[in-house]
Amino acid sequence: MSILTIHARQIFDSRGNPTVEVDLKTSKGLFRAAVPSGASTGVHEALELRDTNSKAYMKKGVLTAVSNVNKIIAPALINKNIPVTNQAAIDKYMIDLDGTENKEKLGANAILGVSLAVCKAGAAEAGLPLYRYIARLAGHEDVIMPVPAFNVINGGSHAGNKLAMQEFMILPTGASSFTEAMQIGTEVYHNLKAVIKREYGLDACNVGDEGGFAPNIQDNMKGLQLLEEAIKIAGYTGKVEIGMDCAASEFHKNGKYDLDFKNPHSAESTWLSPDAMANMYKQMISKFPIVSIEDPFDQDDWETWPKLTSSTNIQIVGDDLTVTNPKRIKQAIASKACNCLLLKVNQIGSLTESIEACKLAQDSGWGVMVSHRSGETEDTFIADLVVGLCTGQIKTGAPCRSDRLAKYNQLLRIEEELGTAAKYAGKNFRHPKV
């Protein structure tokens, strides 16, 4: 089945910034994909092409990337006449067309938009639901429903409070299904709102980019205490565990970590050494039901990562460290830096490379968590992706804001469609049994 037309346009993400949307037509219909973008981006990510030479949209326009799809990728792909079911060949052709290591010529946002639209068209051609088609591309015979990691307290670059760490998450690992996980997650979320309102007032219930609350606290331990209290009030102690995304690259300064980095006058004497940070994490793990910590150190602090990973049995997730890039993942595997990959399709810029990164991590005994970005759209691709890749865990924000709920609602539909065949990862979310 050949591609008839490809058309890209500039739309807006959940933060009001421009992003790329691609429409692809085959004889089976029109298939649309939109590309997300991040706030705390790793320096090693594939290049998201922005119109930095234009003042429009605060220099964040994507008309160059859109033009690259319409004037370069579209005619070349249509002329090449590769079947839409040959995802790997189409992705490789676009990567070769770009010819740079980090996709800086055409833009990772241009290539990814086409790549995701091709996948949706391929699923239709194969007569399969998108999640089943992705499972086939990844070589999986079965699929699994993921544990959602709801980001319910926002800090770091995602919120205007003083909290250094970016995300405090709840994982309903004790649920028996994804549907029950949604019930547990939303009930804890609403109880958390009541707790925050009681302690800090109504304006502390404003939400951040990903739908989590952003109370003006600075003590990270306090964030964990608020979660623990909300879980207890909701009646789910033991059924809900805690995850964190520290995004430590954001507050890494001169080899140390500044937990007061949003204060321009923060005292250097209070900055923590890498070992002091590691000890703080160990303290947190001993006091709270923490099962996952993401980016606990700077993206190039290769020396400190393995120390924490080897000294704890919880999940240590690489995001800015690995940026879904096979080269960085191999380096992290060799140095035993972490034991889980955060998978973001726009960090690497094509579906085929995302699947390769996922399999590389899984083959090394790592867990894999599929993730949204802080600048999201109504596109639900990652919901089908996490089910098809059988990773067992997804983070796509709080149960609040339509750009986040779109993914969770799609997962509810998938579980409903699977019926009695649906399996929920639960406590085995790190290494789900397919």
Swiss-Prot record:
Answer whether the UniProt record assigns the keyword Lyase to this protein.
yes
The organism is Schistosoma mansoni
Q: In which pathway does it act?
A: Carbohydrate degradation; glycolysis; pyruvate from D-glyceraldehyde 3-phosphate: step 4/5
Task: Cite the InterPro entries for this sequence.
Answer: Enolase, Enolase-like_C_sf, Enolase-like_N, Enolase_C, Enolase_CS, Enolase_N
Its cofactor is: Mg(2+)
Query: A single GO CC term, please?
Result: phosphopyruvate hydratase complex
Q: In the Enzyme Commission scheme, what number(s) does this protein have?
A: 4.2.1.11
Active site, per annotation:
E210, K344
UniProt KW Lipid metabolism keyword? no
- Xref: SMART domains: Enolase_C, Enolase_N
Write out the GO biological process terms: glycolytic process
Amino-acid positions noted as binding Mg(2+) in the UniProt annotation, renumbered to this chain: D245, E294, D319
Question: Which molecular function terms from Gene Ontology are attached?
Answer: magnesium ion binding; phosphopyruvate hydratase activity
Describe its assembly: Homodimer.
Q: Which PROSITE patterns match?
A: ENOLASE (PS00164)
Name the catalysed reactions: (2R)-2-phosphoglycerate = phosphoenolpyruvate + H2O
Q: How is the cofactor bound?
A: Mg(2+) is required for catalysis and for stabilizing the dimer.
> What UniProt keywords apply to this chain's record, in alphabetical order?
Cytoplasm, Glycolysis, Lyase, Magnesium, Metal-binding
Query: Where, by residue number, does substrate bind?
Result: H158, E167, E294, D319, S371, H372, R373, S374, K395
Q: Which family does it belong to?
A: Belongs to the enolase family.
Write the protein's name: Enolase
| Localization per record | Cytoplasm
